[in-house]
Amino acid sequence: MIDDDTLLADGFEKALIGFGYRHNQQIAIYDYHRCVEVLVERDGMSEDDAIEYMDYNVVGSYVGEYTPIFFNRDLMNGYSA
């Protein structure tokens, strides 16, 4: 069940991969690359423009303590636990 306070990113429903918790608050988690695909398909952006838009307008935005997380699997390259 989605908490009433959980913020969802409008227009990125196809990129929602789940929910997590930050300080006992439910946070929506989106796949960064799927968000880029949505912008390319839905808005007709080039991939470079979609990445720039994501980085500046979406990932770079703070909309309060329930701000969604955008998981970028590329940041995991070279990391091993």
Predicted regions and their residues:
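C-terminal alpha-helical interaction appendages
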Residues: 1-81
